[in-house]
Structures are given as structure tokens and as C-alpha cells.
A protein has these predicted regions:
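Active-site substrate-recognition segment that forms the wall
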Residues: 4-116
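C-terminal catalytic lobe of FAD-dependent flavoproteins
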Residues: 87, 91-167
Length: 167
């Protein structure tokens, strides 16, 4: 058992955070002048990066911790990207990669102190990269001051265990 699993068991956090594998692809197209980010309701997005480069993401496979990309994942991304922006079909693939994102029930992260000097900051799922600057600043202030930011009061490890009703 790895240290992560021991900590999760010791602090009763097993059900809190699971991994969701996401695959992305970076394309280059010198003839496309797309400047706006496109988000689709199925989870696919197209993000213009450096001039003529476009990040296409992301697949979501729950409880999948495998390494690398799959043909199925790449096909899904390209099919949806091409449907929205047909000019992307003429692009060159620069890079493909995958990673595992921490997911929590209701997509609500955990940001809590679980023991003296031990904090859990996880579960930001698809928004982690976007929120990391402000979360990092807030957590640094919390560690230095010893005062948890009040806006994080709902993000406890015990939520769902107390004071909540489910229908």
C-alpha cells in the first residue's frame, strides 16, 4: 500500500477524490486565424495558443490511471474539433499527451486541514489549471496566517457526512 492510500485510509478520505484520465492534442495550422476559445457541451474544447497553434481537449475516463493516449481518445477529440472548425482538418499534429485530473463528487474540490500541519487541496478536476494561481495564493496565505479563507468553508473533507440532506 502506498503512502497516499495509507493517508486516505487513516483520515477516512477514500471516497473523496478519484482520478479522471484526460487526453489532449496540440495542432498547428498556419492558415487558421481562430482567436476565441470554443467550449462544447460534450466536454471538448478548442483553445487557441501561440499563433497558429490549437489545444484540443479533453477526454474523460473515470478511474483510469493509464499512461499515454489512445487512438479512440484522439479520434474522439479530432472528430468533435473538425465538426466545429472544419479548417482544423488541414492541421499538423505537434503533440499528444494525457494526464489524470482529481475529481470529487459534484465537482466540488476538497480544501481542508485534516491534521496538524497536514492539508488536502485536491479535486479541482477540469478547472485546476485555471484556478491554480488564486488557489495557490490563498493556500500560501492560509499556511502563513493559520486562518482558513472563509470562502473555502464548504470545501471540507466531512461534507456529505454532516448537515446535508439528499433527495
Amino acid at each position: 500500500m502506498c503512502i497516499r492510500d495509507r493517508l486516505l485510509t487513516q483520515y477516512h478520505l477514500q471516497r473523496q477524490v478519484i482520478g479522471v484520465k484526460g487526453e489532449v492534442i496540440l495542432l498547428e495550422n498556419n492558415d487558421l486565424a481562430l482567436t476565441e476559445t470554443l467550449f462544447m457541451t460534450n466536454g471538448c474544447y478548442i483553445v487557441p495558443k501561440q499563433p497558429n497553434r490549437f489545444l484540443i481537449g479533453a477526454t474523460s475516463e473515470f478511474n483510469n490511471y493509464s499512461v499515454g493516449t489512445t487512438d479512440e481518445g484522439m479520434d474522439w477529440l479530432l472528430r468533435h474539433a473538425y465538426h466545429r472548425v472544419p479548417q482544423l482538418k488541414d492541421s499538423h499534429i505537434l503533440k499528444k499527451w494525457s494526464g489524470v485530473r482529481p475529481y470529487t463528487e459534484k465537482e466540488m474540490p476538497v480544501m481542508d486541514q485534516i491534521d496538524d500541519g497536514l492539508y488536502v487541496i485536491s479535486g479541482h478536476y477540469r478547472n485546476g489549471i485555471l484556478l491554480s494561481p488564486i488557489i495557490g495564493r490563498d493556500i500560501a496565505n492560509w499556511l502563513l496566517s493559520g486562518i482558513k479563507p472563509s470562502r473555502y468553508s464548504s470545501f471540507t473533507v466531512t461534507r456529505g457526512n454532516i448537515h446535508e440532506m439528499y433527495h
